[in-house]
Amino acid sequence: MRFRPPSGARTEPPAADDAAAWITGAVPDGWLTEPPQVVVDRDEIIIWGRVPTPELGAESTDADRSAAQAGRIHQFREDTRDGRIKIALQVEHRYQRKVSWGVRCGDTQELFTHLSAPVMTRLRQPERQVLDTLVDAGVARSRSEALAWCVKLVGEHTEDWLTELRQAMTRVDELRRQGPAA
């Protein structure tokens, strides 16, 4: 039976500090080219594995390489399905979190199945503060709109831009305080 969190009051799952080591030991030799990368949060454990990149001739195009990598990922998914399910059930029982699998091959990656939950329930306080900053600054009308905006804007300069926006808002607040009394 798959793990299902109890309804009602939220309880913290057990610590998963050793999850990466446990999962590395549970994954059969030969499945992956390196130890799996394990990402843990309160709700889910994602196991990322890297599979060998297919060898193609020198004349192959980027499209050929992409197709070969997608094919390798698909084959891994099919060949290891029963074993991955068995490991996932053990991990879910041990750590009381849902388990998802993802595979990387060359430049291609695919997350097979993953926990789907309402976005706002999964955000931590720092993420909500980013959304609130965008709403307060008038960039978005709601947290949902701010989240959609963030997804479109994600890039290397996002943090710099948010810092500048917060500084500008601080300056606006200072100017409001200096203004005439109402």
Language model regions located:
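Surface-exposed, Lys/Arg-rich phosphate-binding patches that contact polyanionic backbones
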Residues: 126-144
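Short secondary-structure junctions
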Residues: 26-34, 91-98
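Short, basic amphipathic alpha-helical segments that act as recognition/interaction helices
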Residues: 143-162
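Short amphipathic alpha-helix starts
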Residues: 117-131, 169
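Short edge beta-strands and adjacent turn/loop segments
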Residues: 29-56
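N-terminal presequence-like segments and adjacent domain-start helices
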Residues: 1-14
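Short, positively charged interaction helices/loops
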Residues: 157-182
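Short Lys/Arg-rich basic patches
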Residues: 99-122, 176-179
